[in-house]
């Protein structure tokens, strides 16, 4: 519960065991309507591509902040730019865009109240070493019949 926020979460597969007194499951329409900040943390699937589009933005509070450190195509960039310019969306921050590296004609460039950074968390030597260590640990565990970091969709 960061900064005293009430946390709403949505997933296409509801997992009640992840709900706590500080985090409650909400359907997307409720999440859009109730949130001051929307932060995307999900893989990209055909079903959620463009989930933040004009229609979704219209359901959001005026001045909402949108964060995307997941996948660029989750957001329709033209619709977000329009909402930023009009003030419907108060601000956005992201380290992913629909086409990387970002092109000069990306509609988000030059938009109001947006922070764009490169998606390079993996770049430092320490991060790459950690990735290799995790890969080795995963392989060893798999070979021992005890897989870790299993993701079930």
Region locations from a protein language model:
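Conserved anion/nucleotide-ligand pocket segment
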Residues: 1-8
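C-terminal helix-to-coil terminal segments
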Residues: 98-153
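Short, structured coil segments at secondary-structure junctions
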Residues: 3, 21, 110-112
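Short alpha-helical functional segments enriched in proximate histidine and acidic residues
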Residues: 2, 34, 138-142
